[in-house]
């Protein structure tokens, strides 16, 4: 399963860069001569340094190739967590909204101690649970705007070609935001988990809960004071 993380990073990077290059070929959601209600930057291109693929046709080739890699890799990941029962750690539970709020309070220094957590805290669970669904939405909306005539039922289900393209763009933005946020939190809250991505071994005594760690706070391992003399 650890390998799927690295494949996801590469595939998502290729898809985002090539997708933005495709978007720049027509940086609007409305049809020509029409207006669109929900995007204030209509007609504004994405900076070229964020794009990938060189030209429209090249970007499309990269985009479709990376799409299949991401889809197959996602299917492997979902099959793995299902077969090994790890999906139970990700499915939201009744108390998760309350626990997520406690984590927010802790990160904002309103709460002093790190809330107790299992394998993941409630905020992590919400992100990990949302990512596969966003991936599915990105794939379905992408297929809808790729084959709007052959798969008209799917395109219409998304609200038509314009809205399918809009939802596809937002799925990409949210995937990027959650991925960047995840990477930021790993490096600033739980850097000791990074070796486990390769080795699979994790030291609970260095967990964020054990260190009472917030972003960029308490990064060092906890100090164990010697017992006081009698």
Please report, for each region that a protein language model flagged, where it lies by residue.
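Membrane-embedded alpha-helical bundles that constitute the cytochrome b-like, heme-associated redox core
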Residues: 1-230
């Amino acid at each position: 399963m650890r390998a799927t993380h690295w494949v996801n990073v590469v595939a998502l990077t290729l898809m985002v860069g090539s997708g933005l290059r495709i978007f720049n070929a027509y940086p609007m959601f409305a049809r020509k001569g029409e207006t669109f209600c929900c995007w204030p930057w209509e007609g504004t291109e994405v900076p070229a340094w964020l794009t990938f693929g060189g030209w429209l046709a090249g970007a499309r080739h990269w985009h479709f190739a990376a799409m299949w890699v991401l889809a197959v890799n996602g299917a492997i990941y979902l099959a793995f967590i299902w077969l090994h029962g790890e999906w139970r750690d990700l499915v939201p539970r009744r108390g998760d909204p309350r626990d997520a709020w406690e984590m927010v309070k802790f990160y904002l220094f309103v709460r002093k101690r790190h809330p107790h957590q299992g394998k993941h805290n409630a905020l992590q669970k919400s992100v990990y649970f949302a990512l596969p669904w966003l991936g599915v939405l990105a794939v379905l909306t992408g297929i809808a705007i790729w084959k709007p005539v052959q798969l008209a039922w799917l395109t219409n289900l998304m609200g038509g070609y314009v809205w399918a393209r809009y939802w596809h763009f937002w799925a990409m933005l949210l995937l990027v935001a959650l991925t960047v946020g995840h990477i930021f939190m790993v490096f600033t809250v739980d850097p000791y988990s990074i070796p486990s991505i390769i080795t699979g071994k994790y030291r609970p005594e260095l967990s964020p809960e054990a260190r009472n760690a917030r972003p960029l706070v308490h990064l060092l391992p906890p100090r164990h004071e010697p017992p006081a003399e009698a």
